[in-house]
Swiss-Prot record:
Its EC number is 2.1.1.222, 2.1.1.64. It catalyses: a 3-demethylubiquinol + S-adenosyl-L-methionine = a ubiquinol + S-adenosyl-L-homocysteine + H(+); a 3-(all-trans-polyprenyl)benzene-1,2-diol + S-adenosyl-L-methionine = a 2-methoxy-6-(all-trans-polyprenyl)phenol + S-adenosyl-L-homocysteine + H(+). The lineage of its organism: Bacteria, Pseudomonadati, Pseudomonadota, Alphaproteobacteria, Rhodobacterales. Pfam families: Methyltransf_23 (PF13489). This is Ubiquinone biosynthesis O-methyltransferase. It comes from Roseobacter denitrificans (strain ATCC 33942 / OCh 114). InterPro entries: SAM-dependent_MTases_sf, UbiG_MeTrfase. One of its GO terms (biological process) is methylation.
Length: 248
């Protein structure tokens, strides 16, 4: 049997392999994601609750939903989804991330199925999910359209994909490359390549080409005064997130 094609970029994976042990250090190399996580979770939970008619005030609102966190890293999103009752699979192409994620989940009393694999491999295996979380991954793959097609194949009809990435414009270069990597040193230099960033309109087009119906998009906006992130319906100039649905 022929192995599935992959959009994994080995040079991108190597960057995150080198940082694997630091995933749960809130002041370490993944500090930006820890800061962004409450905002990401706000958007994700709202979209899932709306799409599947779930009450977020209930004890386990996502019980019965199967969620894939692709590019799961150390489990910063997978763990909250499990706490909300979902059956969670966390997948990452960086092998060293998986034992870090597994140990932390065990220490937290959570059952999460972590796998060293890719979207393409999971699709080839016939895996199906209600929700695919595709957060800060698409700007690191070799072929965004092929990757997004694999993500669509992983969804059940009527399933939801939440995809976040970085806009490509002068402001995002200043904020995400110069600011985050060189000035603030939140991330190691070279973590991102500005040429791989994707504009919101480009991402909407790619989602449609992959067979998805985009239904929403918001910006993640950093406030340097409060040192926190917020969702914005208008400012998609740097970080942004989209929701799309697979036709039933």
């Amino acid at each position: 049997m022929q192995a599935p094609q992959t959009t994994v970029d080995p040079s991108e994976i190597a960057k995150f392999e080198a940082m694997a042990a630091e995933w749960w250090d809130e002041n370490g190399k993944f500090k930006p994601l820890h800061m962004l996580n409450p905002c990401r979770l706000d958007y994700i939970t709202t979209q899932i609750a709306g799409e599947f008619d779930r009450d977020l005030a209930s004890p386990e609102p996502f019980k019965g939903l199967r969620i894939l966190d692709i590019g799961c890293g150390g489990g910063l999103l997978a763990e909250p989804m499990a706490r909300l009752g979902a059956d969670v699979v966390g997948a990452d192409a960086a092998e060293r991330n998986i034992p870090v994620a597994r140990v932390h989940a065990e220490q937290s009393g959570l059952t999460i199925d972590y796998r060293h694999t890719t979207a393409e491999a999971l699709a080839a295996e016939g895996e199906q999910f209600d929700v695919v979380l595709n957060m800060e991954v698409v700007e690191h793959v070799a072929s965004p359209i092929d990757y997004l097609i694999a993500c669509r194949q992983l969804l059940k009809p009527g399933g939801l994909q939440v995809c976040s990435t970085l806009n490509r414009n002068p402001k995002s270069y200043v904020m995400a490359i110069i600011g985050a990597e060189h000035v603030m040193r939140w991330l190691p230099k070279g973590t991102h390549e500005w040429s791989k960033f994707i504009t919101p309109d480009e991402l909407y087009d790619l989602l449609r080409q992959s067979g998805m119906d985009p239904v929403d998009r918001k910006g993640f906006v950093f406030n340097p005064i409060s040192w926190s992130w917020k969702l914005s319906g208008r400012d998609l100039s740097v970080n942004y997130v989209t929701a799309s649905v697979k036709p039933a």
